[in-house]
């Protein structure tokens, strides 16, 4: 019988970013209580030797599973030291992988109070609205003009420590294009 391969999307992430994200998740689960119902699985609880941890986030009758890996093949860069993250949405026997932005939106919808477009309608009807969004990572678009005007009236409260964002965990902070200084540009780039 042949080997059967399963391909998964795994974002390469440096280990310090993974450690920070894990500590933010644990803080939100055990200290602040914002992440009620979340489940953290340690590496020694998993039968797979490459799994560093799993965070199970219930979303109604489905759940989001964020798995961190270690001991993977290194990437093209020196700092890609075999650490990675995969994000999976599961409902009963069906599962699919999702990107970090969608994961943040799903978490945002289920767990955090938000001052969103619906707040405008609620305020006009006389209902009490939440004055600010607690989880800014869940927004990936610019709001309507009404929303921006109402949001500008309310000064956002800084949350310490920040909420654990999957997008922030998987962003590529190393390969961002560098800006050149001055009008002459970089000496190495223009051949001088």
UniProtKB/Swiss-Prot annotation:
Residues 14-17, 74-79 are annotated as: Interaction with host APOBEC3F. It comes from Human immunodeficiency virus type 1 group M subtype B (isolate BH5) (HIV-1). Residues 176-186 have a biased composition (Basic residues). Residues 75-114 are annotated as: RNA-binding. This is Virion infectivity factor. Pfam families: Vif. Coiled coil: none annotated. The record marks 150-151 as: Cleavage in virion (by viral protease).
């Amino acid at each position: 019988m042949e080997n059967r391969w399963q391909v998964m999307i795994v974002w390469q992430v440096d280990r310090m970013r993974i450690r920070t994200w894990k500590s933010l998740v644990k803080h939100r689960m055990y200290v602040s209580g914002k992440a009620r119902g979340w489940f953290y699985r340690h590496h020694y609880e998993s039968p797979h030797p490459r799994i560093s941890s799993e965070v199970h986030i219930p979303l109604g009758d489905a759940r989001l599973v964020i798995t961190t890996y270690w001991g993977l093949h290194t990437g093209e860069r020196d700092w890609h030291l075999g650490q990675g993250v995969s994000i999976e949405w599961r409902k009963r026997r069906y599962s699919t992988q999702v990107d970090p932005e969608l994961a943040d939106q799903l978490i945002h919808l289920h767990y955090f109070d938000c001052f969103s477009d619906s707040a405008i309608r609620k305020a006009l009807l006389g209902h009490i609205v939440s004055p600010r969004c607690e989880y800014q990572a869940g927004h990936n678009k610019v709001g309507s003009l009404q929303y921006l005007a109402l949001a500008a009236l309310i000064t956002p409260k800084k949350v310490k420590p920040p909420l654990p964002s999957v997008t922030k965990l998987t962003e590529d902070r190393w390969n961002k294009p560098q800006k050149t200084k001055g009008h002459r540009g970089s000496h190495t780039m223009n051949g001088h």
